[in-house]
Amino acid sequence: MTGREILHKMKESVKEKVGLGASASSADSGKGKSKMLKQITHGFHLVKGKAFHEMEDYVVAKFKEVDDNELGLFAIFDGHLSHEIPDYLCSHLFENILKEPNFWQEPEKAIKKAYYITDTTILDKADDLGKGGSTAVTAILINCQKLVVANVGDSRAVICQNGVAKPLSVDHEPNMEKDEIENRGGFVSNFPGDVPRVDGQLAVARAFGDKSLKMHLSSEPYVTVEIIDDDAEFLILASDGLWKVMSNQEAVDSIKGIKDAKAAAKHLAEEAVARKSSDDISVVVVKFQ
């Protein structure tokens, strides 16, 4: 085994230990649970799509102790024309969020600032990371009581409350932000048979990276806070490989009867494949009960 192969194997081992999941193989999965409230569990599952490139979906799913607090850190990063940028986000975005001095007092502001700092760094490192980009949806569960969700792009977060699906993210579609894009000097294409695209290229209006389009794109996240009470049953984070073929309520209904979070995530991914999704698919499920 060469030195390069040994280093690669060490990196993959570290990723598995800290709860990161991403692979060029056909499927990858994992699970974990809170030490604070053992009934809160998480599971994830990834399936590579049919495109002839490396897997571009990356996942974070882990619990982390910070001083006397416990944080659940969950994320989906869906790359486009890049696996380096979602991989970078896996390693650095939560780290940057938690570095913000006002995180505990004002998590929404801290997250917005960290998203901006992280995107700026990605653009500065374009020679190394490439000129592609990535969507993101992140969820931070603070002491099993408060959930702070942020997103850019079309990776989505949905919470199930008393059997009803409630979106905690916004799909940043180009048509929804057409005025802002045009004010920055860009345009939104609407060709027959195709989705709306920024400058005729990108199907989302907000993303990390995409240096060649950045003047016309935003990386400012939509942020929302949800208190986890007795009504909260579970949370789903997923890339658009799932949401292209399944509505929020269909996804919730599909796993209501599945107690194990990892099995629930796998079921959703497999159902998306059965519905002819050809994209990379990544799913995180967090069970609150």
Swiss-Prot record:
Cofactor(s) annotated in UniProt: Mg(2+); Mn(2+)
Binding-site list for Mn(2+) 2: D78, D240, D279
Matches recorded under InterPro entries: PP2C, PPM-type-like_dom_sf, PPM-type_phosphatase-like_dom
GO molecular function, one term: metal ion binding
Pfam families the UniProt entry points to: PP2C
CDD domains for this protein: PP2Cc
Record: residues binding Mn(2+) 1: D78, G79
Reactions listed under catalytic activity: O-phospho-L-seryl-[protein] + H2O = L-seryl-[protein] + phosphate; O-phospho-L-threonyl-[protein] + H2O = L-threonyl-[protein] + phosphate
Manganese listed as a keyword: yes
Residue ranges of every copy of the PPM-type phosphatase domain listed in the record: 41-288
EC number(s) on file: 3.1.3.16
Family classification: Belongs to the PP2C family.
Protein name stated in the entry: Probable protein phosphatase 2C 39
Native species: Arabidopsis thaliana (Mouse-ear cress)
